[in-house]
UniProtKB/Swiss-Prot annotation:
The chain crosses the membrane at residues 58-78, 552-572. Residues 1-57, 573-646 are cytoplasmic. GO terms for molecular function: ligand-gated sodium channel activity. It comes from the Eukaryota. This is one of the three pore-forming subunits of the heterotrimeric epithelial sodium channel (ENaC), a critical regulator of sodium balance and fluid homeostasis. ENaC operates in epithelial tissues, where it mediates the electrodiffusion of sodium ions from extracellular fluid through the apical membrane of cells, with water following osmotically. Residues 586-646 are annotated as: Disordered. Disulfide bonds join C104-C290, C214-C221, C267-C274, C380-C467, C405-C463, C409-C459, C418-C445, C420-C434. PANTHER family: AMILORIDE-SENSITIVE SODIUM CHANNEL SUBUNIT BETA, AMILORIDE-SENSITIVE SODIUM CHANNEL-RELATED. One of its GO terms (cellular component) is apical plasma membrane. It catalyses: Na(+)(in) = Na(+)(out). Residues 610-619 have a biased composition (Basic and acidic residues). Keywords: Cell membrane, Cytoplasmic vesicle, Disulfide bond, Ion channel, Ion transport, Membrane, Sodium, Sodium channel, Sodium transport, Transmembrane, Transmembrane helix, Transport. This is Epithelial sodium channel subunit beta-2.
Length: 646
């Protein structure tokens, strides 16, 4: 039974192979005529059925409309491969997670705690101010200086490494450079700054304050110029401050900053009391101790708000203690705050806003939820795992953001180029923060990287936006707080609650009130969806084919069939041509068999083998006739088994 089925299957494939070897059995012309006569597409049938003139007309129309179909198909395929998206927008109100709120004091350290550390640095800055400041006491706006600081003792360890200089550009081709801390230059009788014959404008145009940045043991130096002495001093002060505090342990720096109970005086959320204990501490390189409300870290439950308005949001009273500000560090007295997602790192310096002391600041929040399509529709990243940059902010258990990626990328370049890490960013594994003792050339290297356009563009190209992101749009309004009639009792109560003092220790210069709440419409969802898909592509391809030529999928199959048949015939013809060519190459030059040796010998001795030039006709020798049979049947008999007939 099984052997019989195998035999039948073998015979079936044998016959199929024979049919393939023989081909369709038609010529090209016969195939085209058959296709035009049997296809369901409109147009080709008219080419073979109509008269000569109409044949030409229908042939041209068929070619034109076929070209239009292929052109439209090309446009549709290109549109599909462009992976376009459609954007939908929805606005409304619903119960939502309240954003995480990070608050900082713009002054990172209490001056009373760090004054011993900064004594020498502050004296240096005061001396520099005396030597570059201007006075408008006279009509000529002459420069005045403080003689009491003429004999001040300057610590060379602080200023020799990165000195402040004044560049005299009276002769642009040959500028003169003076060290601000050099007493012999600035207090000589003929020093340039004591010249009172020039006014303030000419002085500002002539003299520029700069930082001198040197590498390779002071053999290669550049000057970082500033348009204002204030900018130069503050930049230089920040740099020196970072060098000083790089040797201070983090725990000590935290103790030198503002405690949560000192900064956050009162707290209400949704009408329910809260306190500084509901805030999570985080240390910021620029602002010191910062505190985050509703961060959602370490399994903490996040808080939600179900109603709009200030009564259902967060209310805070902050005290920034302006009398504890470092005099040469911060020129702005305010609180710095930022609204961000839960479990995301707050980049307060770059994305935060200020809250002014002596005011009540109300912030109405609208949540923008952005949802982008993944690759290939966009270059966004889902969680940052496909970004070739190590996220240094993972130690805070925070989610991916483009800000964290850019800073991690810059820190990697810093470690690679300068051989040390910058103190403002997290420390990569196997590296150390920059110090003057171990890395004497790190400051010029840092400024070179910071000013490098190529480094910024490289990091921007590596870092991608997250596919799902949330932004908080804020409408901010302010009013004086407290009012003149209420400030006395409010300050008494706040002072007592802060340090149990009956004396007023809180004043308008440091007090801030914040109201953060949802607007009437608290969310706006902007989401992307694919503008084209396979269903869209197939329907449009079929629509164009049906509109221009009245065809369908079966017509495409018919067209594919004739193409396969034509290719089949072409292959068979090519194989036959190759086979015939091989046979011609293998065919002998002479049709008769070659003569034997004896025949060749006899040809030289027997003249009968010589060529006869005359027209001699040899008589035919009569042959033997064939035998007589009653019948002669010559037929090709092909044995056919009974199974095959069945």
């Amino acid at each position: 039974m099984i052997q019989g089925k195998l035999k039948r299957l073998k015979r079936y494939f044998t016959r199929a192979l024979h049919r393939i070897q023989k081909g369709p059995g038609y010529t090209y012309k016969e195939l085209l005529v058959w296709f035009c006569d049997n296809t369901n597409t409109h147009g080709p049938k008219r080419i073979i059925k109509e008269g000569p003139k109409k044949r030409v007309m229908w042939f041209i129309l068929t070619l034109v409309f076929a070209g239009l179909v292929f052109w439209q198909w090309g446009l549709l395929i290109l549109t599909y491969l462009s992976y376009g998206v459609s954007v939908s927008l929805s606005i409304g109100f619903k119960t939502m997670e309240f954003p995480a709120v990070t608050v900082c004091n713009t002054n990172p350290y209490k001056y009373s705690r760090v004054k011993p550390l900064l004594k020498d640095l502050d004296e240096l800055v005061a001396t520099a101010l005396d030597r570059i400041q201007y006075s408008s006491q006279t009509q000529a706006n002459t420069f005045t200086y403080n003689n009491t600081r003429q004999n001040v003792t300057l610590d060379p360890a602080l200023w020799n490494h990165i000195p402040l200089v004044v560049i005299d550009e009276n002769d642009p081709s040959n500028p003169v450079i003076h060290n601000i801390f050099d007493n012999s230059v600035f207090y000589s009788k003929n020093n340039l700054l004591r010249n009172s014959s020039e006014d303030q404008t000419s002085y500002a145009q002539r003299y520029k304050v700069a930082m001198k940045l040197c590498t390779n043991n002071n053999t290669q130096c550049v000057y970082r110029n500033f348009t204002s002495g204030v900018q130069a001093l503050r930049e230089w002060y920040l740099l020196q401050l970072s060098i000083i505090f790089s040797n201070v342990p983090l725990s000590d720096r935290v103790d030198m900053g503002f405690k949560a109970e000192d900064l956050i005086l009162t707290c209400l959320f949704g009408g329910q009391p809260c306190s500084y204990r509901n805030f999570t501490h985080i240390y910021d390189a620029d602002y010191g101790n910062c505190y985050i409300f509703n961060w959602g870290q370490e399994g903490d439950d996040t808080m939600s708000s179900a109603n709009p308005g200030a009564d259902f949001g967060l209310k805070l009273v902050l005290d920034i203690e302006q009398d504890e500000y470092l005099p040469f560090l911060q020129t702005t007295a305010a609180a710095r705050l930022i609204l961000h997602q839960q479990r995301s790192f707050p980049f307060v310096k770059d994305l935060g806003i200020y809250a002014k002391p002596g005011t009540e600041t109300s912030i109405a929040v609208l949540v923008d939820q952005l949802q982008q399509m993944e690759a290939p529709y966009s270059s966004c990243t889902v969680n940052g795992s496909d970004i070739p940059v190590q996220n240094l902010y993972e130690e805070f258990n925070s989610s991916y953001s483009i800000q964290s990626c850019l800073r991690s990328c810059y820190q990697e370049e810093m470690v690679k180029t300068c051989k040390c890490a910058h103190y403002q960013y997290p420390l990569p594994n196997g590296s150390e923060y920059c110090t003057n003792n171990k890395h004497p050339d790190w400051v010029p290297c840092y400024y070179g990287l910071r000013d490098s356009v190529a480094i910024r563009e490289n990091c921007i190209s590596l870092c991608q936006q997250p596919c799902n992101d949330t932004h908080y749009k804020m409408v901010i309004s302010m009013a004086d707080w407290p009012s003149a009639g209420a400030e006395d009792w409010i300050f008494h109560v706040l002072s007592y609650e802060k340090d149990s003092s009956y004396d007023i220790t809180v004043n308008r210069n440091g007090i801030i009130r914040l109201n953060i709440y949802f607007q009437e419409f608290n969310y706006r969802s902007i989401s992307e969806s694919e503008a084209t898909n396979v269903v869209w592509l197939l329907s449009n391809l079929g629509g164009q084919f049906g509109f221009w030529m009245g065809g369908s999928v079966l017509c495409i199959i018919e067209f594919g069939e004739i193409i396969i048949d034509c290719m089949w015939i072409t292959i068979l013809k090519l194989l036959a041509w190759i086979r015939n060519r091989r046979q011609r190459r293998q065919r002998p030059q002479y049709a008769d068999p070659p003569p034997t040796v004896s025949e060749l010998v006899e040809a030289h001795t027997n003249p009968g083998f010589q060529h006869d030039d005359g027209n001699h006709v040899t008589e035919d020798i009569p042959g033997t006739p064939p035998p007589n049979y009653d019948s002669l049947r010559v037929n090709t008999i092909e044995p056919v088994s009974s199974d095959e007939e069945n």
